[in-house]
Curated annotation (Swiss-Prot):
Protein name: DNA repair protein RecO
HAMAP family associated with the record: RecO
Gene: recO
Keyword Amino-acid biosynthesis: no
GO terms under biological process: DNA recombination; double-strand break repair
Organism: Cellvibrio japonicus (strain Ueda107) (Pseudomonas fluorescens subsp. cellulosa)
Length: 236
């Protein structure tokens, strides 16, 4: 199979054999693919300079197996120079996708959300809402999203003035009388997250805790390396 001029972002690059690179690419049509860029490690030319993260490429490849061979790379001149926590956030998104997105598994709208998030990071928009929205979309695409609007036991709407507990496999349910208040989640925060409203610091804190809780069984015991780049109290 031959594919021409497919938009792509490099999520990860690692040495392959003596002179090549093994690339994880995110594409809108084929999802995440793994491809070999032959000979680029010994090249100092234009092609090698293109193979950097946060640079939207137009890629040609061929191959019937899961491992593709890159036959051409062009730029569409959309390159984002991220810095500081915005750069680390970009690395965090890339690592999440490499770790969790199965090869050639297409999640509708994920490429566009990824690109939009990078653009927003470049513009200097607040990090936490951007990361949480991306995380929750990825969880939904992977089949692990929770319903923030309904009690998973009673199916009644979440109430702003009530408190809930989280079951990562089922959702949120009203707190039993004998439950530990340390784990209570205000319904107001759940409704705010569902609406994409992260204006309150407590909502941002709860959203971050929930995202970590939901990703934990998917990521396993191996920690995300990109988290080591952030300072304590950062939005990752």
């Amino acid at each position: 199979m031959r594919v021409d001029l497919q938009p792509a972002y490099i999520l990860h690059a690692r040495p392959y054999r003596d002179t090549s690179l093994l690339l994880d690419l995110l594409t809108p049509v084929y999802g995440r693919i793994t491809a070999v860029a032959r000979g680029v490690r010994q090249s100092k030319g234009h092609k090698r300079q293109l193979l950097n993260p946060f640079h939207r490429l137009l890629v040609n490849w061929q191959g019937k197996s899961e491992l593709k061979l890159i036959t051409g790379v062009e730029t569409d001149h959309h390159y984002l120079q991220l810095q500081g926590n915005a750069l680390y956030s970009g690395f965090y998104l890339n690592e999440l996708l490499v770790r969790l997105l199965p090869e050639q598994d297409v999640i509708t709208g994920l490429f566009e959300r990824y690109e939009w998030t990078l653009d927003a990071l470049h513009r200097g928009e607040p990090l936490e809402p951007l990361l949480r929205e991306f995380e929750f979309m990825l969880l939904q695409g992977l089949g692990y999203a929770l319903d923030f609007l309904h009690d998973c036991h009673s199916q009644q709407p979440i109430q702003s003035g009530y408190f809930y507990l989280c079951d990562i496999h089922q959702g949120f349910y009203s707190v039993p009388a004998d439950s530990d208040p340390r784990f209570w989640i205000a319904g107001a925060h759940l409704l705010a997250i569902a609406a994409g409203d992260y204006s309150a610091a407590d909502t941002r804190r709860v959203a971050k805790q929930l995202a970590r809780l939901l990703f934990k069984p998917l990521l396993g015991k191996r920690p995300l390396k990109s988290r080591e780049l952030f300072t304590p109290g950062s939005p990752h």
